[in-house]
Amino acid sequence: ALLQALDKKEAKRILSANDLNVTPMLDTPHSFDELAQALSGCSRGCFLKPRYGSGAGGIMAIRYQPRQKKWVVYTTLQKVDRVIHNTKRIHRLTKEQDILPLAEAVMHTGAILEEWIPKEQLQGENYDLRVVSGEEEIDYVVVRCSKGGITNLHLNNNARLWSELPCTRP
């Protein structure tokens, strides 16, 4: 089960098969040109993620304006001395020459490309939920909050209580 959870394509397939909503996936790009083409039709942007793993390792939140050829990418990846590292810090990139090798490295993992769905807000921060369950029982829920679009807690983001959400009832 753990291996299935770390395989993003397989996890999405299982969740969908059990009538749970998942972030819409786009066709997987295999080159930087295909990525730019896919992003041209995605006004909110997309997340390019390695197929396997967790903890924001290797993800890229990407926005692209094709008319201006303008890129904005948020990622934990950084290329240092021709080696790509997961820095556990979010970097903002705008130069195609910096973005291209990172995106190609992620695509070589059998990446997935997801539509960027805006997150709800709680007290001025974006949030999402990390839900852990076994069988049909929810074990716990963590509300993950961030000023940006990437909410993973190991990136110095904030955890909040479920009871702080305006939609929850005691």
What role is predicted for each listed range?
Residues 1-41, 54:
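Conserved N-proximal alpha/beta basic substrate-recognition cap immediately N-terminal to
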Residues 11-17, 39-63, 73-75, 103-121:
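ATP-grasp fold ATP-binding core
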Residues 25, 53-58, 127, 156-158:
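Glycine-centered flexibility motif
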Residues 26-29, 63, 142:
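Residues at the C-termini of beta-strands that transition into short coil/loop
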Residues 38, 42-44, 95, 129:
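Broad hydrophobic/π-residue packing in well-ordered secondary structure
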Residues 65-170:
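ATP-dependent carboxylate/phosphate-activation module, predominantly the ATP-grasp catalytic core
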